[in-house]
């Protein structure tokens, strides 16, 4: 007569199912953590589900640091803390931890301990395919969660193509720039020259009313005259200060106009594209793919007097005469000599005051 087969499972990851188990997830986890094993536990995930007959079941994934050779089929038995009852599991070695984790996630009532240990079994022919992994990443809702999904379900792609994946997810989960809220109402700028007011009425508006080729404006004046605050109070805009950042985190193709503030004209990239309100142009980035700019919106250039700031002085340089002839056809140049406001009209808006008082 053949000897009964002795129980033995030698695996790094275990999948346990406890049928008709009344323990809570927390009670089960506490007992599992007390089990003495020759290799450290790295991760435990427990799911509690109710079957059609109303009986509770527990599913568990246990990951060890190294292989655990289990020869006792009662090793993982659990006991009730309140009554004389033992719960015996079905024990299997988990060939793919990712697949087991996905399976026990299906009901949502889960408890985790430790850090999940990624394996590549799914990508080598398990239930999970690359398309499934990327579909799950897209449905994650957030970039950080999508990266976690790809790291777990497509680890090879995560390591070899991280740069492209990261860049693509920035596009998929693009976060629009937060709308700017001016601390001052436009009406509080009561010393604005007629020349500026007229320019605004002709060029700053939504796309339906905007001229096909708006005219830009260069405003030169001393510091603390209100140039920046006035320019930013006119409507939805892109604000580029000190240098140009045309990434989608900063630059919106839906803005009504651009504000370029305190950028030395000698080093202003895309001078003509901005000043000429040009449409459909590209900006090459140092480490990324070219950025497509919709364009067709005017730009307010703000500067102080001086050779490293003034657009007028820059265009008056002998080498820039051709550029100057082009610029005066595409922009107006205004020099202001006094603040655009009176002190009594520079109280913040009520909305801004509320924010300040709460801070």
Swiss-Prot record:
Amino-acid positions noted as binding ATP in the UniProt annotation, renumbered to this chain: 221-228
Q: Where is this motif: RCR-1?
A: 15-18
Q: Which Enzyme Commission numbers does its entry carry?
A: 2.7.7.-, 3.1.21.-
**Cofactor: binding comment:** Divalent metal cations, possibly Mg(2+) or Mn(2+).
Q: Source organism's superkingdom?
A: Viruses
**Keyword entries, A-Z:** ATP-binding, Covalent protein-DNA linkage, DNA replication, DNA-binding, Endonuclease, Helicase, Host nucleus, Host-virus interaction, Hydrolase, Metal-binding, Multifunctional enzyme, Nuclease, Nucleotide-binding, Nucleotidyltransferase, Transferase
Please name the GO terms that the record assigns under molecular function.
ATP binding; DNA binding; endodeoxyribonuclease activity, producing 5'-phosphomonoesters; helicase activity; metal ion binding; nucleotidyltransferase activity; structural molecule activity
Q: List the disulfide bonds.
A: none
Chief place where the protein resides: host cell
Would the keyword Hydrolase turn up in this protein's UniProt record?
Answer: yes
CRESS-DNA virus Rep endonuclease domain segment(s):
8-116
Per its UniProt record, the required cofactor names are: Mg(2+); Mn(2+)
The similarity comment for this entry is: Belongs to the geminiviridae Rep protein family.
Q: How does it assemble?
A: Homooligomer. Interacts with the replication enhancer protein (REn). Interacts with host retinoblastoma-related protein 1 (RBR1), and may thereby induce the transcription of host replicative enzymes even if the cell is not dividing anymore. Interacts with host PCNA. Interacts with host SCE1 protein.
Q: Explain the purpose of this protein.
A: Essential for the replication of viral ssDNA. The closed circular ssDNA genome is first converted to a superhelical dsDNA. Rep binds a specific region at the genome origin of replication. It introduces an endonucleolytic nick within the conserved sequence 5'-TAATATTAC-3' in the intergenic region of the genome present in all geminiviruses, thereby initiating the rolling circle replication (RCR). Following cleavage, binds covalently to the 5'-phosphate of DNA as a tyrosyl ester. The cleavage gives rise to a free 3'-OH that serves as a primer for the cellular DNA polymerase.
Protein name as catalogued: Replication-associated protein
């Amino acid at each position: 007569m053949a000897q009964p087969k002795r129980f033995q499972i030698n695996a790094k990851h275990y999948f346990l199912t406890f049928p008709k188990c009344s323990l809570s997830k927390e009670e089960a986890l506490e007992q599992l953590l007390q089990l003495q094993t020759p290799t450290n536990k790295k991760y435990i995930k427990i799911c509690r589900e109710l079957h059609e007959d109303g009986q509770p079941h527990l599913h568990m994934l246990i990951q060890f640091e190294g292989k655990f050779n289990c020869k006792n089929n009662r090793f993982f038995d659990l006991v009730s803390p309140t009554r004389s009852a033992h719960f015996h599991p079905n024990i299997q070695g988990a060939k793919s931890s990712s697949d087991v984790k996905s399976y026990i996630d299906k009901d949502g009532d889960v408890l985790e301990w430790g850090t999940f240990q990624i394996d590549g079994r799914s990508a080598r022919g398990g239930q999970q395919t690359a398309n499934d992994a990327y579909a799950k990443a897209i449905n994650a809702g957030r970039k950080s969660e999508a990266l976690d999904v790809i790291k777990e379900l497509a680890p090879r792609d995560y390591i070899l193509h991280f740069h492209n994946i990261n860049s693509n997810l920035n596009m998929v989960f693009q976060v629009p720039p937060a709308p700017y809220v001016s601390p001052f109402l436009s009406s509080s700028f009561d010393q604005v020259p007629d020349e500026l007011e007229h320019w605004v009425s002709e060029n700053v508006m939504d796309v339906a009313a905007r001229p096909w080729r708006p005219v830009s404006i260069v405003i030169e004046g001393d510091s603390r005259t209100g140039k920046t605050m006035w320019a930013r109070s006119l409507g939805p805009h892109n604000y580029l200060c000190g240098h140009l950042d045309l990434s989608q985190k900063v630059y919106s193709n839906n803005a009504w106009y651009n504000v370029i503030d305190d950028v030395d004209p000698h080093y202003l990239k895309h001078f003509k594209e901005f000043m000429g309100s040009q449409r459909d142009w590209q900006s090459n980035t140092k480490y990324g793919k070219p950025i497509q700019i919709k364009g067709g919106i005017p730009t307010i250039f703000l500067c102080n007097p001086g050779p490293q700031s003034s657009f007028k002085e820059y265009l008056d340089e002998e080498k820039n005469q051709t550029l100057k002839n082009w610029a005066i056809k595409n922009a107006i140049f205004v020099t202001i000599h006094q603040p655009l406001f009176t002190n009594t009209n520079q109280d913040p808006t009520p909305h801004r005051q509320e924010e300040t008082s709460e801070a």
